Regions:
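Non-catalytic C-terminal accessory/binding modules of secreted extracellular proteins
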Residues: 3, 44-56, 187-204, 286-414
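Zn2+-dependent metallopeptidase catalytic core
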Residues: 36-207, 215, 233, 387-388, ...
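Short, polar loop/linker segments at the starts of domains and inter-domain junctions
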Residues: 85-97, 258-265, 337, 357-358
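Extracellular hydrolytic enzyme modules, especially secreted metalloproteases
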Residues: 159, 172-331
Length: 414
């Protein structure tokens, strides 16, 4: 997961051009508009062979689907070349209940991640420096680390009881690199207690850790891709694809709730909460972060949670445009700007290759410089009273009003 780098103040000359115009209909309205009754399946992109493909037509059975309670074991690893200065309880508290709370809110209560942290350190057989831990870890050193960790823990852990495995290293050991935290996917699974272990989250975070870092890595366990852009030389801005708008882009984002597309993929949205738009359509979009009873920007906490969360326009065999409302609610409580967010989805793009890219409705301005991970996209949503035509696709969205509960009324014209 990337750490923040200095951000350039100048906008890229490659910024997209938009057409903005004010709308007259900005008053509150009390009820939803009629949505075009197209089946969500008509806009469900097909899952491809790309790593962590954004296809939503089927679930990849190689990954656990987070639509029930899943159990996660946290194994704390110490090394002969260091005496831990923290306790397993302290490290567990770095990540829980924050990680479970994030997923509870993101899933509208449909998924619970239940942690099972060990209460003691488990000693690795070799010094931390011998594993040459780093971000771009060599396969041989990584294999040594995982093999030793599994062998050391197997006497104390029944791995057959758990859906997710976290190996948490002593953050103060000299060979531990906090930039190396990641999910390791194994072509040949490790075997313990009669069960295959196909992926492990290797945690090397400092104490205290980066915000929501474990939630980001756990997203990979559920087949979600990296949405950040990694510069070839390691320098420059990592957040040009999605900015603050999804945890899989940055765990530091102001609005880190998972995209509606990801909630659809994970099984947290009912088909009726996704509208496939094939002709001019008026509909009401609930704020993505609002579950049943969740207040939205001080508005009453009623009437939201089970309505439409995502509108989709199919643009090609492997591409689509997605529209969702982002307001200060739930995991998005700290959002910089609210409105209707527009983004492109590419099912054929692999993790890290831009499978989702936010489209900036205000390409000549930026916002929240002091807090945003990428200010040029912090004001990307189409605001109340604005219209926006998506460059290259000629799809227009008009944000016409708000309901008393805080939902957004929009018209989408493909």
């Amino acid at each position: 997961m990337p750490r923040p780098f200095p951000r350039p103040r100048l906008r890229s000359t490659a910024a997209v051009f938009t057409t903005m115009s004010a709308l007259a209909a900005t008053s509150l309205i009390t009820g939803p508009s009629a949505a075009e009754p197209f089946s969500a399946a008509a806009c469900a992109l097909t899952r491809t062979e790309a790593h962590h493909s954004e296809g939503v037509d089927t679930w990849n059975a190689a990954y656990p689907q987070p639509t029930r309670t899943l159990d996660a074991v946290m194994v704390f690893l110490s090394f002969p070349d260091a005496t831990p200065r923290t306790t397993p309880d302290q490290l567990a508290a770095d990540h829980f209940p924050a990680t479970s709370r994030f997923f509870e809110q993101a899933s509208y209560g449909r998924f619970t991640l239940r942690p099972h942290p060990l209460r003691n350190w488990i000693r690795m057989p070799r010094p931390s420096t011998s594993y040459v831990i780093e971000r771009d870890w060599s396969a041989s050193h990584r294999a040594d680390y995982l093999r030793d960790a599994l062998a050391a823990a197997d006497g104390q852990v029944d791995f057959s009881r758990y859906d997710v495995v976290y190996f948490v290293a002593d953050p103060d050991a000299p060979g531990v690199d906090s930039d190396a935290t990641k999910v390791v996917n194994l072509d040949t699974p490790m075997r313990a207690d009669g069960t295959d272990i196909r992926r492990v989250v290797t945690v090397f975070e400092q104490h205290p850790p980066d915000r929501l870092v474990l939630a980001h890595e756990t997203g990979h366990v559920f087949d979600l891709p990296d949405l950040y852009h990694r510069p070839v030389d390691g320098k420059g801005d990592w957040d040009t694809y999605v900015g603050d708008w999804d945890l899989m882009g940055s765990q530091f984002g102001l609005a880190p709730d998972l995209f509606g597309w990801h909630k659809w993929k994970l099984g947290w949205l009912d088909p009726r909460q996704v509208t496939c738009v094939g002709k001019p359509t008026r509909l009401t979009l609930e704020p993505l972060g609002a579950g049943p009873g969740t207040p939205v920007a001080g508005r009453p906490a009623f009437g939201l949670g089970r309505g439409t969360k995502l509108a989709v326009v199919r643009t090609g065999p492997e591409t689509a445009l997605a529209f969702e409302a982002r307001s200060p609610a739930g995991n998005d409580a700290g959002t910089c700007k609210e409105g209707v967010l527009v983004y492109r989805v590419r099912a054929g793009a692999a993790s890290g290759g831009g499978p989702i890219q936010v489209i900036d409705a205000h390409p000549h301005t930026e916002a929240c410089w002091e807090a945003s991970v990428y200010p040029p996209l912090a004001d990307a949503p189409v605001a109340l009273g604005e219209s926006f035509t998506v460059p290259g696709d000629d799809v227009r969205v008009e944000v016409e009003g708000r309901t008393v509960a805080g939902a957004w009324t929009v018209k989408i014209t493909p």
